[in-house]
UniProtKB/Swiss-Prot annotation:
Domain notes from UniProt: The protein kinase domain is predicted to be catalytically inactive.
Compartment annotation: Cell membrane
Cytoplasmic topological domain residue ranges: 505-1135
Residue ranges occupied by any Guanylate cyclase domain in the UniProt entry: 895-1025
Transmembrane segments: 484-504
Protein name: Receptor-type guanylate cyclase gcy-4
Biological process annotations from GO: cGMP biosynthetic process; chemosensory behavior; chemotaxis; intracellular signal transduction; receptor guanylyl cyclase signaling pathway; response to salt
Residues annotated as signal peptide: 1-20
Encoding gene (name): gcy-4
Keywords, sorted A to Z: Cell membrane, cGMP biosynthesis, Chemotaxis, Glycoprotein, GTP-binding, Lyase, Membrane, Nucleotide-binding, Receptor, Signal, Transmembrane, Transmembrane helix
Residue spans of biased composition, Low complexity class: 546-560
Residues the record marks as carrying a glycan: 37, 193, 209, 251, 349, 375, 431, 436, 447
Amino acid sequence: MTQLLRFLLILSIFCDFSHSQRPTIRVGIAAALKTQNGSIGWAYAGGAVPLALQYLKSHGFVKDFDFEFHVEYTECDLTETVRAGLDFMKTKNYDVIIGPPCATPLIAMGTLSTVYKKPVLGWGFVSESEFSDMERFPYLTSVLPSSMTLGTVTSALLELYGWDRIALVYFKNELNYCSGVIEDVETSLYDENYSQMVQVVIKEEVDQNNTENFVATLQMIKARARIIIFCAQTGAEKRFYMIQAGKQGMNTSEYVHVMLSMRSVGFGVQSAVGKKPLNSGLAPIWEAFQVAPDGLEDLAKSVASKMLVIDLSSDIRDKEFLQYMTKNIVYAIREPPLSCMAPECLAANATGMGAYARHLFDVFYMYGMALTNLNSTDPNIYGNVDLLVSKFTTPFEGMTGQVQLNSELSRLPLYQVYALNKEYDQISIMNISLINGTAKVSLAYQNESSDVWHFWGSTRPLDTPICGFLGKSCPIPFFDQYRLLIFVFVIVAGLLILAIFTCLTSMVRNQRAEQSRLNSEWQIHAIKLRIPEKKGRRLSTDSENSTVTKSSKGSSSKNFETSEFNENYEIQFLENDLVLTTAHQVQELSNLDKMRLVKLRKLDHENLNKFIGLSIDGSRYLAVWKMCTRGSIQDIMSRGNFSMDYFFMFCMIRDIAEGLNFLHKSFLRLHGNLRSATCLVNDSWQVKLAEFGLEFLQDDEERPTQKRLLWAAPEVLRGSLTVSQMDPSADVYSFAIVASEILTKKEAWDLHKRKEGYEGKRGNSKIEIIYNVKKGGPHPFRPTLLTDSDVNKSLLALVKDCWSENPEARPNTENICKIILDMTPRTKDNLMDHVFSMLEEYTQTLEVEVDERTKELVLEKKKSDILLGRMLPKQVAERLKAGQAVEPESFDLVTVFFSDLVKFTELANKCSPFQVVNLLNEVFSNFDAIIEKHDVYKVESIGDGFLCVSGLPNRNGVEHIRQIVEMALGFLEFCDKFRIPHLPRERVELRVGVNSGSCVAGVVGLSMPRYCLFGDTVNTASRMESNGKASLIHMSEIAHAFLVDHFPYQYETNSRGEVIIKGKGVMETFWLLGRISMSNRSTPPVAQLKQLPQKCSSFTDTGTIRSVSPYIENASDSEDEELRRVMRREMMRVS
């Protein structure tokens, strides 16, 4: 690149030599070779002149001119500047002078230019406002604006953010650049045209070499200001300021450091070295680019984040040439036409260029443009300075941005205020231009908090801290000042919020609870539903006229013949009540569906079947309806065994119309599924509509059966309409079909008897009917109304109007109800009155029949009581009838009677079975008559045997022996007089045995209960009978003693002597001969018995307890023979 530049410069010189006739512009340059190398040093800035000349020629300027340059190193010395100026202007008469780059020497050079009328091009530290005085310096011009404009821009920034308390800090150096800038800024702040009064609390000049003094200044600023405006000439001074401010803790969000600059560098420095360059291509000022790394970059960076920079706009269009200029400026100065061979020029390297090199470039470029714009071939015209200077006002794009001078040869500046974004790259937050000395601010951000003050906590800093600069003037915190009020307010607000929250929570809870309660009303758990047990075809037995019977206690004793109920329903138990259920597919229920179910459950009308709820937790949805015990109209018609008169049918039709009218006026709007199967009948023969309002639930069947379509209106069949698409007139058509079923007392369309085929062919009658209905036409297909003669013709006409082919021609339900009301017979109010009037006709007949049956019942009860009393003791029978248990009872002393007909077997052989029965019946009947005259209980009679007892179950003291004796005598007296009709020569003889003692009595058995006696007394009485003689009363010793002791001299007895009794041994027994006053009988032939020895053999009876019906042994001839054998053996042994 260096070789190329050298070639281009030499080539341009040779080309210029080839045009010896062109005018030569002689340029005198007052430069500073050893002063401020980083800013105005000739080694780092002088190369801008040949580069500007090259740039002019590349853009078509100064083609007709040759240039001759003469450089004098006046540094910034006033004497050397005056000497060089006189030499340039007076002695050598140069056309234009450049420099010097310092303010004070430039004043002298400008004064000489006024005297000698030579244009002077100023650059470097020449921003003082006095250079704008055209009367004093008419030929001095510069591309740097006046520092007074910087003061105006600073004032505008302070006014924008409301800062009126500031500190001014500037660095001291040999050129006094910052002191002039600060003076102009301060002058602008106190300008009378400035509306905001700004207080400068501190104005201090600091020195980079005096750190202690600088720190003291910062300490004073901390105590008095938070908005600090400072001016630093070099990058090192800027970084020094940031480091020291950071060390003093001035990098918090309270501080704003405003840096003033007029070099178009912003947060950058003119250096080619940088770790991370800014978007302007310059190195950031916080980097240690001129010294060795010191580790303080982060500290400096923290202060930079709290900094704003006011600088000239750096919007350069030809950035590519600027980069070229930056890299080659130190090489260009060594080449012709300057050919600087000074050690400083030769030692310069490509680390960067001087800060004011771009201003030197622009001011020479402006001069070249002015020369060209004179547009004249007269060489003398270029000596017209006034005309030349007037051309300086032509605007152009330079290396410092847009350059435009006003009529006073002062640049019209465009300032920008820079800040750092979150990535620490500089951004322009506003543009400030000057129009007629007035600042015009143009903001470049949308949100001040986030775009400008993000490093300040998104809050604009104040010029005075709230708590003062020393933190001792903090206002009393609001909480401390109003603690009591706040405490009370918090409590009240808390209670209020708590109350509001409680109310809202309660409202929400109540609303949810109410919704849950409403949902629980229609939700029925599947576990509550159960299918009743079926016994055959019936659930239980009941009358033919009723399907459900409730007991008087209101229990669920219900029964129903399931085969006679419509197949659409399933009968189940809900708790203890029978209900009807319809099955539906499981699906998701929306909130609207749930609200519909709540409304549906509340729907109530006397002609609507009550919807109880929906079971949704089973394998299928079950809609639960109230049980209507008589089934549906379809069920009644299908049974065919019920007779209805006209009024009965009329009332049913009226009930259907009333229920349908109510539905049409409700939120449901229509029924949509009206059929005879959905018209249910309750106990009172009242019709109730069912299966309405659940069209959003899908049935188990995917599509309606053909039978259901028999009730559908023609327009519904043609369009396959859903319930939501139907019109109420479709219900009116269905009502007419149901009414035709009732009037004809037949199933819809008389389906079971239809035999015609479709188009002459035999086929499905349902399909034919549906097809004919859909077909329509002028004579639509309808059911035949063949009714009884007593049916009102107007009612038939109404039915025909209701099934009209045109839906609009059908009457609505309200008109139907009015027409039916007009047809109601005046003598009858309702169906139940009609039924009651029919029942009254049977009332009297039923009452007479009930009375007769009641009398018969009483009579039969008496008979049964008498019969039961004969079979069991009265008190025992009463306890058994009451369902009480009869405990066995022990009796201390009773008398037991046994009897037997002597030689009954021989007698029975002479008689037929019927004669035997008649004989026993006559004898025992007389015996029963005799028993009734005495206090004796007949235990039983088995065959010809007879068992009686006295003293139980009614205790009668000692009277029992006399009652048995009197009864026995009565039996003998009857037998003595009794004659057998068919055997007159035969006699009935009785053998009697009597014994007294203790006994146990009780009831044995359940199916045929018997009152039985237990104990040895009974066995002994039986032995007395079996060992007795015909027509004699054989008594035990105990019975005899009891009779003689208690009833002496009343009865005649005779000792039989000792007798061997089976199971008892030898016992002394007695004969009862009769009453003493009445006894004329001879003593029985028992003398031989008295001769028996007193000592007899004993026989042991192993069975001492007899059964209820003891076996009575026949002790007649065989026993006598055995007795004789025993007597003989004893007599022989004694002898």
